[in-house]
Every structure is written in structure tokens, then in C-alpha cells.
């Protein structure tokens, strides 16, 4: 059975404080047990627990590890789903291996985030990403970025393309009407940074596809829910590249 993961400011210290210490206490972690401390940026420390309180956990670090980031790096652009499906989308994307997640307020997005509530929603996504990363035993916790509109996303994609050599389309958009299969993508030409775009429940409009300039691909004949599409796409990319 894999060890439980906890986020620590400094895994090498063998110390947990704050919410993570409370979490360990609630999980009834006891002295003598082993846990894995991570910093969310690839550093991990196998730790034998020596004491547990609701506010602090102390332990002895037995082994330190540096986990390399998967390559190629995949950023998921997730159109914001409505209700509880939003957190499900984040959960599945993290389980699938997303390296970063960008909330997207597309033209057809049903769930709109008012300006005065955006910060709270982003924090919910970040909390979910951390929880899911620990559950998935990941040393890297995906970054959840600030939400973007379609025009802002287009600018992000152009900026990412400008940093690369060549003019390959490095962004893939999952689309039910695409004629190309994801298995036919020449991933070697996309470089070390791939953007995977998932549309809303109402679908991505033709005008948005044109603005984004992304490469439409399909996973198969089935139409997936927006909350599960990124997971399926990430699994396909994992199998078709060196990520897995």
C-alpha cells in the first residue's frame, strides 16, 4: 500500500505544521508510521513519524528524492463546468497528470464567475488540486492559474508559440467534429509544452476555434462530459508520449 502524502514547507525538515498537521492527526497517523512529505515542486522525503499533535507532526527523514517533472509538460485549459462538476474536472485532470490548469470562461460557459467571486473560486480549484495530487501520490502539485476569457486565452497561446522555434500548433482542442484522431498527432513536433483545451457543456463555437488557432482532435466516437474529457485526453497523451 502506498504511503500517505502531505505538503510540507521543507520536506527535508521532517516537520508538518498547520492544516497538513491537522490532516495527519485526523487521519490518525501515529508515531512509528511512515509518510511522504512533498513540497509540491518535485521534492519528496520518506519520513518516519516520531510525534503527532493537531498542530505539529515531527519525524525523521529516512530518504530524500527528487522527482523529475513529466515531459512533455501538459497544461489543461478547462472551460468552467457548472456546480460540483467543476471540482470533479479538477480532480480528474490532476489524476490524469495535468501539470497546470487554466480555468476558461468561454463564450458558451454556463457557469459565470462574477469578478467579486473569482478569487474564491480559484482558491477552491487550488485546494482541490492539492487534495487530488496527494491522493494520486504526486510530488508535483499542478498550478491552477487565474481564469481567462477566450481572447485572453488566445493571447496566452500566441505567447507560448512565440517562445518556441517553428510554427507548429502546440495546442490541441478536444472536439467531437474533429476529423483527426489524437493518435495521429505528431507529438514530437509540439515540443516540451502542450496545451490541451476542453470546451464547455455547450461546445466550442467555430468562431472560438478560429480565434484560438488550436488543432482540433477527437478521442473516439463517444462524446465525453466536460468534467471527464481532460482526464481521457491526458491518458491518451500519456500513452502516446514519453510521459508514461
Model regions and ranges:
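N-terminal positively charged helical leader segments and presequences
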Residues: 1-66
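RNA substrate-binding interface of SAM-dependent RNA methyltransferases
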Residues: 66-170
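Generic beta-sheet signal
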Residues: 74, 169-172, 192-198
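Conserved beta-strand scaffold positions in the cores of enzyme catalytic domains, especially
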Residues: 144, 171-173, 214-218
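A C-terminal functional module that forms or caps the active site or interfaces directly
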Residues: 186, 190-210
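Structured adenosyl-cofactor binding patch, chiefly the S-adenosyl-L-methionine
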Residues: 206-244
